């Protein structure tokens, strides 16, 4: 007695099992988290170290190099990159997916602490954070007021909003855009300092002496104890202005005599505006792999409770929220599930024309899908675009077994058997075929589970979701389906009006197939050249269809990055960015908000568009118009960018090509020629390279002999310049319970040209004031403003945006061609960002594809106890792939992760049809019918179930092919590939399988 017979004989048991599946499914669904995609972010740790005033070369040699040298030995590092720029070193360490984020952070902290002894004494201690320094924020809270200054708003943002938001679980960091943090700025006048015989070093020494508070002990009496506190710290502008710098000739020289103290912003070279209004923005950056929706919900909740703590005149709003796209995208896929369910039920009814028979699959579909949610919960998965796509695809799949089982039982009832007898016999006949097709389908997705890297992580949930649905649907098809069939199905003495009207069509279809199949089998040799033609078509189209990682989605967001030429001032770039902002306002009426930010050296205009349903133009069309418009603004450079589907790095273009060399001189030599060819290439719309050699610098050459004769050391000169020009932190002061920096430098207007250095004086060891001009010579030069390393090598990363109609695959091929023409043997190339993921995923998917074919062949060989019979089924695979590629090419689709997974799915889907025919033909042969007649009869008998299951799969996927709204492009890519493959393969399989079977299969009638 098999499980189907047991369910028929014990219907209550079968019902209880079904209720348990539904119950656990609902419980699992209620506990599942929601996110856009499965967690595929590599663990990334950033190390940042500041050394104010130091140039890129000093930072590279004294900070970046020792840190990298120590970090490099940590196991599990995937890549390590660094940027050494003016005053700061930033190292980004990316680990393999298998490495735990906490373990990685601890390893890096350990290595950084060991390296600290090699760093300059006066640099800030390195900080280690669990996030990419270039990670994209997911949400921005804006803070504005018509009564308060940006300094006050920044304080509110820091003390109230940031403090609350950074404690949210899985938040890596909270930044304040446009922050004007309080600082005590000491502006020094070099002429007055020279008159009083004061140097910047004297100011630093005076602060170290006077702005100090040390523990002073206590006074103990017989009954009381008093703690002594020496009030040595300065808090107000007046106290700093009254600071005694030195005493000379019975005269006290105060800071106010040689300069002034004022409470001002720490960073004077940055600002942020939203919709033209200056304000500050608090942005939230998630940890790698964090659930963005959970974080956003927590932010909304905290902001709601925080409103009562904010002053009445302070208004908060949301500048952007990336999770709106995620929520809408998930809702769109949910809607598709319902559409697919309705379409599948309609097609089943049209084929069976009996509401009782149709009711059985109607029950099986929800049972299979709801039960899948419990398996997803047990596996630790989430509700995301891919797991929901798995549910959509499952709607058409899970119904197949139920249809085949129900139809087989119904045929017997119509022949006059009792429902119970028909159920037992019908289930027994189809039992093996149901298990075979299900095992085959699971075998397709099994290789995906073992795929490494981002692709494997992405589609693990997808493949496990479908596999889980197939397992539950198989169980339902073998238990509840035969039980329901015996309870619901009865022999119809009189056919319905609808049945009578439509039956001639089905009879005619059967007769047409019988005639055409007989004709095809008489010329069955045609099948072989037809398969060869399909294989050739696959080879041609596979190369012809452009490839990319994933199609670009309309996320209702566009970003424009602005860059000034090296040496351009902050004010120059600010004016240019505001010009771009005005351009956006005039060209994009669909903009909901426009946020402009400028800091030293770079600017950004971020456009949040209205929802897709509310505008006529797509994000891509708007970006195309903006790209053309910003090219006319030639005072500086602007790049229009759109966020990639699988990407979190801020502001990166799709093509990231890294050139590595052993010396900076070789890069300087080769880069101009390489970039010229990139600019001339029609494949790229725009291009840039991070390594520049154009930042002007004034080099100070010290006359050491003269300096030593006059009693001035190199250290004296360097310190005087450091404290006078670099805006060096000279200490801290406290205000409102918070610590702020004391910054000192010479007035900007008194040091705006190299000749102004003459007015700076240095004190000799004899106490004499010596003009710096007597000891140094000035030499103007150019140098790289930033130095880059990639995997320890000096590097330059060429970033390129793609021309219209071009894909990342074509872009990388073009870069490879230019590199082959331009670079010598002493260069190495590497890929970064989306480019690296694309190349790795391509090879990974090809491995999964070949493994799926091999696994299915082996499983079928085991099922049929023959190495020949599976060949009949496997030869239908080229038909499906060719169909998919033809439909993709006709609809302008690219070869991407979604379409490739669809193609892998097709292997299992078309194999199902072949199994049904071959299994029945083998049974007929064993009953004594010869091979040719057996395959003819089996094909005719299986025609309706094959057409019905294929039509249900196709219609279940049809909503994907016409998807609109958020995240539609990925769904369309997958839908077109699978529907195209199914349409072509279903029509051809009905003829090719019988023809190949007659040639290849084992002759069982003689046994």
What residues fall within each predicted segment?
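Short helix-loop junctions at transmembrane helix boundaries
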Residues: 35-39, 322, 373-389, 449-466, ...
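Juxtamembrane segments of multi-pass membrane proteins
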Residues: 531-629, 633, 638, 674, ...
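Interfacial segments of transmembrane alpha-helices in multi-pass membrane proteins
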Residues: 5-12, 288-291, 327-384, 450-454, ...
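Helix-loop junctions and hydrophobic alpha-helical segments within the transmembrane domains
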Residues: 319, 326, 330, 406, ...
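Membrane-proximal extracytoplasmic
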Residues: 1-341, 383, 457, 636, ...
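Signature of alpha-helical transmembrane segments and their immediate interfacial
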Residues: 2-34, 428-430, 498-550, 607, ...
